[in-house]
């Protein structure tokens, strides 16, 4: 069956008749001809298109599935002679290269008039190439990939790709049945970039790059810079352009007014495909913002949105770094979701995965036949934990690819924060590697200096270009200066996940209350280092999968006690210095582990379910925690200032009690007291000093509306000799604030 060339618009009128054949063109050099047909020629534009020769202008066209090809000049059609192998040529007695089109006839009688891709000058400028060569193109997506545009007065798409080791590159499309023979690209010198402008190609066209390696192998690769991709399991890239009109100008204008460290920051972590399985980006925009706003969270954190082939990877094995996953809709549909969240007053953080990428043969791995995005040293290229490739952070073009990608999501999709995954695996050369499987750095150390420099460059660039954006590190070691500015030697992140607090506190609450006295330090140790970095306290997806159990199921005791433990824990967490993050489903005490196949168990909240009130009670507490948190500056204004915290009771191990004060910038305190024992403690003394003339309970996780027993302090409590005596409910946290008598 003949292949239909849809790369060019249909002619506006009838195809001109063919008056006759052209003169014979000089033959191609056999070597050039062989390389051209093999897809291994660096400059096909020097062979194809129109060129002066003795006697006129020679035209040469490569259309392997055509029956006949003609040239139309000034409305007259001239038939080119077949040279076999899909080549057609001829000479017209012209003084100069004219404006012309091609008429291509296919075997089944279909005929099209088209522009010739090989009559155009490069559609990529010298400045772009210079910046790419230096690794400093901060808007790389505007230079590489598939860019719909008007070039020399003709609409089409410019295709560009970085493949410095390739002998040749061709554009293969759906309309050529993935045969790239007709569309070889030209090399733009030492930049390693290949380019071709295809007239008439528009949005929705599926394409790949056909790479001819220096080893003689030919294979198809998805575009590393593709801004859209087919829905998996299909793997082609898709030409796209955004026409989205944003409605979040007010949000974007004001998001940088207050530093994130001095503002409320309560995060709801979401896996979009499973939050409400089956919903698209636009359908999620109808439900997610309203739900998050109702619960009082200030931000959502989206597990990776970039395209990935394997759903159960949850997005952490990315193949399309510049393309939102097509599973839920188009790139503009994703913009619609972000816009809806912003208009609801919700910030959007996105998980970003620059540590590694999968080995799928159509993706980044050995992209041009050689290690390109990954290091050439196999000891460094392989990630031992995940069976993936690591990025070559020492290569300027690779760093540019990743730094520009971070900027891309912030500028093109209005993302407010990037949570960088697996930072520790990037920073250490010996991460998960045995002796002999890694090589020390130039100073003999285990630190990956190139990865460190990359993270510093990424952070500095994002903060310079994108005011109000915050970067967050998932860094699980004691690497110093993760959130210290880059100009003082730090990595430059805005926040860091406090993995130590998470592990220690979950370890503590998992013990039976009678044994917690022996683990008291696990709840207090975090304050030893609480101000060494700017922390987020994460109860993330990683803690509720793979046998770790859901948060409520980690707790000891019967159902009432497990819920009480969760409520007490959340009250402690929200009051502790640092921002907080909670994964979906934990806000209503889902008992089952998270599964990406079914998502949260929303049916637990249904009125007809006999225990729905128990789950709604925890959900109501989370709503109240966020409401109180946002309205109480003492809980967020001085998260990074040691003067914003004071222990009141730090060593009451026998009682399982913790008490501390938080202070706002104006000195107004909040007293948080947690009783992790199952007994009521009456007249419990706390030396609060002269902070207030009286204290009023403002939150009690044991309140009946949250599913508790209703034990508490309904009346204001006055200090005597600097101490107050209050009732501590069992397995509960209470917050008290100054009360004006």
Swiss-Prot record:
Subunit structure: Monomer.
Name listed for the protein in its UniProt record: 1,4-alpha-glucan branching enzyme GlgB 2
Name of the top EC class for this enzyme: transferase
Signal peptide interval: none
CC annotations in GO: cytoplasm; cytosol
Function: Catalyzes the formation of the alpha-1,6-glucosidic linkages in glycogen by scission of a 1,4-alpha-linked oligosaccharide from growing alpha-1,4-glucan chains and the subsequent attachment of the oligosaccharide to the alpha-1,6 position.
One Pfam family of this chain: Alpha-amylase
Annotated active site: 421 (nucleophile), 474 (proton donor)
A GO MF label: hydrolase activity, hydrolyzing O-glycosyl compounds
InterPro entries found in the cross-reference section: A-amylase/branching_C, Branching_enzy, GlgB, GlgB_N, GlgB_N_E_set_prok, Glyco_hydro_13_cat_dom, Glyco_hydro_13_N, Glyco_hydro_b
Catalysis: reaction(s): Transfers a segment of a (1->4)-alpha-D-glucan chain to a primary hydroxy group in a similar glucan chain
Top-level lineage group: Bacteria
The family this protein is said to belong to: Belongs to the glycosyl hydrolase 13 family. GlgB subfamily.
Keywords: Carbohydrate metabolism, Glycogen biosynthesis, Glycogen metabolism, Glycosyltransferase, Transferase
Region (Disordered): 1-38
Pathway this chain belongs to: Glycan biosynthesis; glycogen biosynthesis
Recorded coiled-coil stretches: none
Enzyme Commission number(s): 2.4.1.18
Gene Ontology biological process terms in this record: glycogen biosynthetic process
């Amino acid at each position: 069956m003949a292949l239909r060339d849809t790369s060019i618009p249909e002619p506006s009128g009838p195809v001109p008749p063919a008056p006759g054949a052209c003169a014979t063109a000089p033959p191609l050099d056999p070597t050039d001809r062989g390389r051209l047909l093999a897809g291994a020629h660096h400059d096909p534009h020097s062979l194809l298109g129109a060129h002066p020769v003795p006697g006129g202008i020679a035209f040469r066209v490569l259309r392997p599935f055509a029956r006949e090809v003609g040239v139309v000049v000034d409305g007259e059609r001239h038939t080119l002679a077949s040279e076999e192998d899909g080549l057609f040529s001829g000479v017209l007695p012209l003084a100069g290269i004219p404006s012309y089109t091609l008429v291509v006839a296919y075997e089944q009688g279909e005929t099209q008039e088209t522009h010739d891709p090989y009559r155009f000058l490069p559609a990529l400028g010298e400045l772009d190439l210079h910046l790419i060569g230096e690794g400093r193109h901060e808007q790389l997506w505007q230079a590489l990939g598939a860019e719909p545009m008007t070039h020399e007065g003709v609409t089409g798409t410019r295709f560009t790709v970085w493949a410095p080791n390739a002998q040749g590159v061709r554009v293969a499309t759906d309309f050529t049945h993935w045969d790239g023979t007709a569309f070889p690209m030209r090399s733009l010198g030492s930049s390693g970039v290949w380019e071709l402008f295809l007239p008439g190609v528009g949005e929705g066209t599926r394409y790949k790059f056909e790479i001819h390696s220096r080893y003689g192998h030919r294979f198809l690769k998805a575009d590393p810079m593709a801004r859209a991709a087919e829905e998996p399991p299909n793997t082609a890239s898709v030409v796209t352009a955004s026409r989205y009109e944003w409605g979040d100008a007010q949000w974007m204008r004001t998001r940088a007014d207050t530093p994130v460290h001095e503002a409320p920051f309560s995060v709801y972590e979401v896996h979009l495909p499973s939050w409400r399985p089956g919903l698209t980006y636009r359908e999620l925009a109808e439900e997610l913002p309203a739900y998050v706003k109702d619960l009082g969270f200030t931000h959502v954190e989206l597990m990776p949105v970039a395209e990935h082939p394997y759903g159960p990877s949850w997005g952490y094995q990315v193949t399309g770094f510049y393309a939102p996953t097509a599973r839920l809709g188009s790139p503009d549909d994703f913009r619609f979701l972000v816009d809806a969240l912003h208009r609801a007053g919700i910030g959007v953080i996105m998980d970003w995965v620059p540590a590694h990428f999968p080995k799928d043969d159509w993706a980044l791995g050995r992209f041009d036949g050689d290690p390109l995005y990954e290091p050439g040293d196999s000891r460094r290229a392989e990630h031992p934990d995940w069976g993936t490739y690591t990025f070559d952070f020492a290569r300027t073009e690779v760093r540019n690819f990743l730094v520009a990608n971070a900027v891309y999501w912030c500028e093109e999709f209005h993302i407010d924060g990037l949570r960088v995954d697996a930072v520790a695996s990037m920073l250490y050369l010996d991460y998960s590697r045995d002796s002999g499987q890694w090589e020390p750095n130039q100073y003999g150390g285990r630190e990956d200096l190139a990865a460190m420099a990359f993270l510093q460059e990424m952070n500095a660039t994002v903060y310079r270009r994108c005011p109000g954006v915050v970067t967050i590190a998932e860094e699980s070691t004691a690497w110093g200066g993760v959130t210290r500015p880059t100009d003082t030697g730090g990595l430059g992140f805005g926040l860091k996940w406090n993995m130590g607090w998470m592990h220690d506190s979950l370890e503590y609450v998992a013990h039976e209350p009678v044994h917690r006295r022996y683990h008291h330090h696990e709840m207090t140790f975090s304050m030893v280092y609480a101000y060494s970095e700017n922390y987020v306290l994460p109860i993330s997806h990683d803690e509720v999968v793979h046998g770790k159990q859901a948060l409520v199921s980690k707790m000891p005791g019967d159902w009432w006690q497990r819920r009480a433990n969760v409520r007490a824990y959340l009250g402690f967490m929200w009051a502790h210095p640092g921002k907080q993050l909670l994964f979906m489903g934990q806000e209503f005490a889902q008992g089952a582990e998270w599964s990406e196949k079914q998502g949260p168990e929303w049916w637990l909240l249904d009125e007809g379910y006999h225990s729905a009130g128990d789950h709604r009670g925890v959900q109501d507490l989370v709503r109240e925690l966020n409401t109180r948190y946002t309205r109480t500056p003492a809980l967020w204004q001085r998260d990074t200032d040691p003067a914003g915290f004071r222990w009141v009771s730090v060593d009451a191990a026998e009682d399982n009690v913790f008490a501390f004060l938080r202070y706002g910038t104006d000195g107004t305190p909040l007293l948080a007291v947690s009783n992790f024992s199952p007994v009521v403690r009456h007249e419990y003394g706390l030396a609060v000093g002269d902070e207030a003339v009286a204290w009023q309970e403002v939150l009690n996780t044991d309140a009946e509306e949250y599913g508790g027993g209703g034990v508490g302090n309904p009346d204001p409590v006055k200090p005597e000799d600097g101490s107050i005596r209050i009732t501590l409910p069992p397995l509960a946290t209470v917050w008290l604030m100054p009360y004006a008598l």
